[in-house]
Regions:
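Non-ligating segments of multi-cofactor redox enzymes
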Residues: 1-190
């Protein structure tokens, strides 16, 4: 019997992704990575952040992790959201309270509720229509809509995102059970 290890799990997940691609699934990866709330702009965040790790250490949701190369090799250890692990809690501003450099400005809960860190994107071919993303969204930015499958002569429900309401918290991406490829992913804003 072979014990499960992270390497074996990664190999198995890679094989599942290849099989899903063969069945017509589409990979969905962020076009831009998501930085924490409270920054004035991405360029100011990258310039001011020293990668000290206070926001990562104090995040109660554990959604933040140090970047490796997501923001380029000149910006190692800058905090990046990891929606595979968790999501940014709607009523939490802890990361903005502990930043010593001003890369993240303190936010009130009310300001956090409207601070946009990203936008969710749906890949309808991967969506299983379960509705978990819609039920988890704190801003009610996701609904399920019928989508016709003309080749099969039927319609099915798929997630639809209202980006005027989405703030990019990642709750939808975190909860999405579609495997081996998520049906929804959050792209960071500049």
């Amino acid at each position: 019997i072979v014990a499960s290890t992270p390497a074996l799990t990664a190999i198995a997940n890679g094989a599942k992704r290849i099989q899903a691609l063969d069945r017509g699934g589409k990979p969905l990866t962020p076009s831009r990575y998501v930085a924490p709330p409270g920054r004035h702009s991405m360029s100011a965040f990258l310039e001011k952040c020293t990668g000290c790790g206070l926001c990562v250490a104090r995040c109660p949701a554990k959604v933040l992790r140090p970047s490796s190369n997501e923001f380029g090799w000149l910006h190692p250890l800058h905090p990046v959201m990891d929606f595979d692990t968790s999501y940014c809690r709607y009523n939490c501003t802890r990361c903005t309270e502990v930043c010593p450099t001003g890369a993240l400005q303190p936010l009130t809960i009310e300001e956090k509720h409207i601070f946009i860190i990203g936008h969710a994107q749906v890949e309808p071919a991967n969506c299983i229509g379960c509705g978990l993303c819609a039920s988890r969204c704190p801003r009610k930015a996701i609904t399920l809509r019928p989508r016709d499958n003309r080749s099969a002569g039927q319609s099915r429900l798929v997630a639809n995102v209202d980006n005027s309401a989405c703030i990019g918290c990642g709750a939808c991406e975190y909860i999405c059970p579609a495997t081996p490829m998520k049906a929804i992913v959050v792209n960071g804003v500049i």
